[in-house]
Amino acid sequence: MAKMMGPRFKMCRRLGLNVVGHPKAMKRADRGTSRADKKLSDYGIQLLEKQRLRAYYGVMERQFTRYVDQAFNSKEQPGEALLMILESRLDNMVYRMGFASSIRQARQMVNHGHFLVNGKKVNIPSFRLNIGDEVVLREKSRKTEMFVNNFKDSIGSEVPYVSKEEDNFKGIFTRKPKREEIPITIQEQLIVEFYSK
């Protein structure tokens, strides 16, 4: 499976955005060290925004392009449709539900088969959830203290389009998120403009 490689904190500083969720990721960021601090052309600004979004969700270029095509072919506004596609990925929803402390960790957990989706084992991070789908931490995986602590510590801090059943280690994708509810600082219209050329 292809992975996004390279120093993660350095990537965050280069993009001018904490895309890994670690509190120290931007600690050494000085003025002038990120692309966001430099004067860019319109194309450069659009490209940077695309790279930020792709890095945030940990998606490779080819897959990201497929998502963009799907968004443009949908009946919704392309930028919001793209965010909805990315947000509904299993690895992201595992993170949003509080099973993992980062999308990167969530992807590893999914790869290792720690979850059931609607009662069936799914180990594909890019698997797309539908509204109403249930994600459950497998019984044997509940013996891992880190997984249990992640989930219990996140109770009350989940996004509004997710509900959780603490006793059952279950998360439910309850509804389509509103744009303002998705906790990511991205100007998706710039990405739409980038791919509209």
Curated annotation (Swiss-Prot):
The residue ranges of the S4 RNA-binding domain are 88-150
Keyword check for RNA-binding, yes or no: yes
Q: PROSITE patterns from the xrefs?
A: RIBOSOMAL_S4, S4
Molecular functions per Gene Ontology: rRNA binding; structural constituent of ribosome
Name of a matching Pfam family: Ribosomal_S4
Transmembrane region(s): none
What GO terms in the biological process aspect are recorded for it?
ribosomal small subunit biogenesis; translation
What keywords does the record list, in alphabetical order?
Answer: Ribonucleoprotein, Ribosomal protein, RNA-binding, rRNA-binding
Q: Looking at the UniProt record for this protein, which Gene Ontology cellular component terms does it annotate, in alphabetical order?
A: small ribosomal subunit
Q: Which InterPro entries match?
A: Ribosomal_uS4, Ribosomal_uS4_bac-type, Ribosomal_uS4_CS, Ribosomal_uS4_N, S4_RNA-bd, S4_RNA-bd_sf
Protein family according to the UniProt entry: Belongs to the universal ribosomal protein uS4 family.
Q: Report the HAMAP family cross-referenced here.
A: Ribosomal_uS4_B (MF_01306_B)
* Function statement: One of the primary rRNA binding proteins, it binds directly to 16S rRNA where it nucleates assembly of the body of the 30S subunit.
Q: What is this protein called?
A: Small ribosomal subunit protein uS4B
**Protein source organism:** Clostridium perfringens (strain ATCC 13124 / DSM 756 / JCM 1290 / NCIMB 6125 / NCTC 8237 / Type A)
